[in-house]
Amino acid sequence: MLIDVKDLYKIYNEGKESEVRALDGVTLSIDRGEFVAIIGASGSGKSTLMNILGCLDIPTYGDYILNGTHINDRSDRQLAHIRNKEIGFIFQGYNLIPALTAYENVELPLIYQGVSIFQREERVMEALKKVGMDSRWKHKPAEMSGGQQQRVAI
């Protein structure tokens, strides 16, 4: 099992009058290679669930196991390492850094991973080529269409 979530809760302002239960007992299992759609009405907890699955947040209660690793008790630094090595997803707004070129936006995670400059150059251009953006590697997000920005984010 790649992702295994059991009885997951995310409660904001727990025990207070303003308490919000964003997730209330979610159980979910996803196998490697499986495609899953998270659907629901506005305010139903989709983004909260995705933030937890993407290791951007941790649950209030319940268990989250990602590729055999218990996520609940990890430090912020450990979660950042897991995000960098184990999981990724594309945000609706692409989250490209406006001041950086397509090349630099793709290169940035590789820098954080400690990939050598020689390997980075090859991997960045290969990735941009795979999504048809190798000819626009010098362009900043404002100089790209939404679809082009999405391909750079991928």
What residues fall within each predicted segment?
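ABC family nucleotide-binding domain
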Residues: 1-154
